[in-house]
Amino acid sequence: MLRVESVSKDYKEFKLRDISFDVKKEEHFIILGPSGAGKTVLLEIIAGIIEPDEGRIILNGVDVTSYPPEKRNLAYIPQDYALFPHMTVYDNIAFGLKLRRISRQEIDRKVKEISKVLGIEHLLHRKPRTLSGGEKQRVAIARALVIEPELLLLDEPFANLDVQTKSRFMTEMKVWRKELGFTSLHVTHSFEEAISLGDRVGVMLRGRLVQVGDVKEVFSNPVDEGVARFLGFENIIEGVAKGNILEANGVKITLPISVEGKVRIGVRPEDIILSTEPVKTSARNEFRAEVIGIEELGPLVRVNLKIGGITLKAFITRSSLIELGISEGREVYVSFKTSAIKVF
């Protein structure tokens, strides 16, 4: 469907380096990365807004690298939606169809049809300035999909929405995909969007696409320490391994594999279990630890822990914190499964 081959670009403060990946028909492919990684520049190269210094963009077997945007049959929704403020919702949605010189009757049919699917029939007479963020997003998606593009490009599509609206949109996006069968390339910094919507994900760091794969596989098996840190492995521990035992600052940790020499391991905070008594679980690593700090994070709490010469971070709910009576200075038991450990 879409194939990006060895694309590189120096553009302002961004540098893309040898980007290659493919998007399959009717797939929702996520490019996931922090701000400044070059995600938007990559989208604009695919859309034809920016020319690559090197590499090719292949769409349905055709090299479109030199094609202008209007010849690529793509639809691009930027982060600010780019609705025409002087036009009604109806005319915004109809804009691309009019450029294609479609009959007035066919335009009317298509606009009303897509408006019904996206639930915006009642907004067709209004101007963008009177719409909420969620309504503007629906109009932008309708305008993009009504032309039946080969590929829909989405730049941080939920960044301007409140939490509840974003949650509703992600649920509805799955329904729209099933009903309309479109193919999409979606860039975001949000893990939630990647996990909820992505069929596959590519992790982009510092202008390079460093890992591509199934969403679950990428999140559970980051290819290196840099990807692991970005994906939430906050606990990175360095030590010396002998067989399946790692010794780090006097603390011995059982590993999932046998290795030798100096290595680093990563453990997610959410994979660490806290208790006030020793627990009988399948966890093969259990330690006594001192609580050295507590940070409020909305519904979750980050508990900072000291085990001998190493520190760990664990996530628990606020209710669990209260129930366990955990407070700074208290001693608790820390445990985690060997399967939760990623060895680098």
From Swiss-Prot:
The kind of enzyme this is, by top-level EC class, is translocase
> How does the protein associate with the membrane?
Peripheral membrane protein
Protein name stated in the entry: Molybdate/tungstate import ATP-binding protein WtpC
Please explain the role this protein plays, according to its UniProt record.
Part of the ABC transporter complex WtpABC involved in molybdate/tungstate import. Responsible for energy coupling to the transport system.
Q: Indicate the family of this protein.
A: Belongs to the ABC transporter superfamily. Sulfate/tungstate importer (TC 3.A.1.6) family.
Q: Which UniProt keywords apply?
A: ATP-binding, Cell membrane, Membrane, Molybdenum, Nucleotide-binding, Translocase, Transport
Flavoprotein as UniProt keyword = no
Q: Could you give a single Gene Ontology term from the biological process aspect?
A: molybdate ion transport
Output a single Gene Ontology CC term carried by this record.
plasma membrane
Q: Which residues form the ABC transporter domain?
A: 2-231
Q: Which gene encodes it?
A: wtpC
EC number(s)? 7.3.2.6
Family annotation (SUPFAM superfamilies) = MOP-like, P-loop containing nucleoside triphosphate hydrolases
**Species name:** Pyrococcus abyssi (strain GE5 / Orsay)
Picking any one GO molecular function of the record gives:
ABC-type tungstate transporter activity
Q: Where does ATP bind?
A: G33, P34, S35, G36, A37, G38, K39, T40
